[in-house]
């Protein structure tokens, strides 16, 4: 597990946390134009962010998987799920979170993906967001940011780049990096 902390923000990344699985009773998804890629491996990660704002501490946990594929399309899916009585689970950072992605936060996750999905810059393959955790102070803005950062982490893992600079940048400055990790592009 990788953890970065400052006074106002914290981030933690781990390979997986099945206790935050989303069963997918509802889901959104689609196909996006993508760049063909030459090589890459399946990458799975879970990211938790904390951000202090005044007396509030906003939290977001998202996780998923990216698998590079052939062609010029990226199939993406966000599983949405909330139990009637979720059991709190220990997050990656201090404190418990409720597994699930309730209404409102689900839109934030999709929003966090849309800019990159619409750019045509993502590599071809399959992307699924299927892990999430929240609490009463979870923020849609932080969930969108967490989703953007998770995409950086998944692509870095799939193509052998470092995800750490993107995470450190967010913790230090509160902003996601503008450029996605470099991926091997297929020659035509």
Features from the language model and the residues they span:
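Accessory interaction regions appended to the cores of large information-processing enzymes
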Residues: 1-188
């Amino acid at each position: 597990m990788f953890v970065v902390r400052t006074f106002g923000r914290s981030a933690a990344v781990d390979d997986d946390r099945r206790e935050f699985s989303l069963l997918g009773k509802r889901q959104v998804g689609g196909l996006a134009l993508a760049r063909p890629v030459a090589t890459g491996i399946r990458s799975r990660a879970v990211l938790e962010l904390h951000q202090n704002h005044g007396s509030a501490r906003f939290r977001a946990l998202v996780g998923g998987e990216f698998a590079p594929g052939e062609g010029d399309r990226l199939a993406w899916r966000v599983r949405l799920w909330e139990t009637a009585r979720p059991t709190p689970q220990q997050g990656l950072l201090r404190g418990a979170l409720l597994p699930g992605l309730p209404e409102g936060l689900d839109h934030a996750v999709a929003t966090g993906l849309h800019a990159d999905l619409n750019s045509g810059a993502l590599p071809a393959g399959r992307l699924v967001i299927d892990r999430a955790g929240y609490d009463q102070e979870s923020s849609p803005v932080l969930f969108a940011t967490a989703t953007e950062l998770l995409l950086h982490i998944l692509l870095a893992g799939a193509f052998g780049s470092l995800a750490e600079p993107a995470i450190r940048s967010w913790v230090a400055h509160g902003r996601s990096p503008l450029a996605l990790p470099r991926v091997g592009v297929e020659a035509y």
